[in-house]
């Protein structure tokens, strides 16, 4: 199956979300792109997260990483982020892409694959 064929199956592309401390955002984003685990990461520098942790309500400024990647690469992406992340239990979740511009979906699949083959 070619990348173009895969682009027609939008489920082959996922968006992953990961929050992190602002000073770590660019490092984590670059890591997953350089490792060929993602085609692109948007860094939203400041989001407010309100959550319960160890019985207490926390209110923190974080950065949000919006990661475009192949669905197949998500397990490795998740594990890489978990290992490199400063939090004990980082948010790393995957959302399936239901639809998108076919040329963009094809690019996501190709760019991530290109990154992995360049490192080989």
Show where each model-derived region lies:
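Positively charged, small/polar-rich N-terminal and surface patches that mediate targeting and assembly
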Residues: 1-120
């Amino acid at each position: 199956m070619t990348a173009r064929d895969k682009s027609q199956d939008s489920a082959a592309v996922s968006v992953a979300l990961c929050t992190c401390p602002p000073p770590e955002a660019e490092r984590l984003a670059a890591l997953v792109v350089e490792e060929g685990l993602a085609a692109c990461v948007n860094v939203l520098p400041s989001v407010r997260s309100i959550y319960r942790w160890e019985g207490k309500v926390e209110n923190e400024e974080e950065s949000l990483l919006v990661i475009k990647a192949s669905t197949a690469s998500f397990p490795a992406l998740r594990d890489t982020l978990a290992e490199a992340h400063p939090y004990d239990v980082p948010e790393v979740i995957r959302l399936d892409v239901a639809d998108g511009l076919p040329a963009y979906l094809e690019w996501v699949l190709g760019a991530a694959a290109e990154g992995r083959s360049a490192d080989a």
